[in-house]
Amino acid sequence: MNDGGKRFYLVDGDILPEAILKTALVNEMLAKGEVTKVSEAVEKVGLSRSAYYKYKDGVLPFREPGRSNIVSVSLLLEHHPGILSRVLNTVAAMEGNILTINQSVPEKGLAPVAFVLDRSRMSVDLPRLLAELRQLTGVRSAQLVGSEEE
């Protein structure tokens, strides 16, 4: 791939030098807020600061093209104790991260729920998650409403 004179490569992480991999880890730690200082992050991963600064702007995470990591899901739940809790536990068990959630007032025994999900670290695909949610007792429906544009 060529972008303004720069050349980019998609490379299997297994063949990258250790300094590049550790630089990617440091960038991730800083982005997630796990650490606040570069010196703290490089010490944790065992990388020199000079190596980090040499590679930091050249190491970017790969996002699968066409796959949106932020999705909106709509549910219709029966109004009984514990149903929403089971939904949240199911999402968490699959390593999904709920960013926002909204539950409306139940009408006729049913409560609409909508949540926005970061699925970047999920251990299963979205159709499997929706199928698992639909199988839960008290979940009348679960559907994808939308996703962020790539």
From Swiss-Prot:
One Pfam family linked to the record: ACT
Organism: Heliobacterium modesticaldum (strain ATCC 51547 / Ice1)
UniProt record similarity statement: Belongs to the UPF0735 family.
NCBIfam families in the record: PRK04435.1
Protein name: UPF0735 ACT domain-containing protein Helmi_18680
Positions of the ACT domain: 72-147
Origin: domain of life: Bacteria
InterPro entries, sorted: ACT-like_dom_sf, ACT_dom, UPF0735_ACT_dom-cont
